[in-house]
């Protein structure tokens, strides 16, 4: 699918200017291992869409901060506008991860 077809499909399916698009595999996974071609990130950049990153936080501790920071840095300034921590184990786990990620600027 070319750029014009992608833009046309996006316009058709986001009539209210809001859309939720689920990527395949990971945010940067596409046709090539060394660039964004065919990835969800390529589409987001093409359409100038913000990314809300959903992260599986099960069995995660402070290291999740480094993982999220890597995504934010790879995406570039302003591309990722928020993070949802999914599959939290408990309220204590949520509190712990919020503290671990508190210094992150998104």
Regions found by a protein language model. Give the residues of each.
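ATP-dependent carboxylate-amine ligase catalytic core
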Residues: 1-47, 55-82, 91-95
């Amino acid at each position: 699918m070319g750029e014009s077809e992608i833009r046309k499909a996006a316009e058709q399916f986001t009539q209210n200017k809001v859309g939720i698009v689920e990527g395949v595999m990971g945010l940067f996974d596409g046709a090539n291992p060394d660039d964004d071609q065919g990835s969800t990130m390529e589409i987001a950049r093409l359409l100038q869409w913000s990314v809300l990153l959903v992260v599986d936080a099960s069995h995660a501790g402070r290291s999740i901060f480094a993982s999220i920071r890597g995504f934010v840095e790879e995406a570039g300034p302003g591309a990722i506008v928020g993070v949802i921590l999914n599959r939290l184990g408990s309220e204590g786990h949520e509190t712990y991860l919020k503290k671990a990620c508190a210094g992150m600027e998104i």
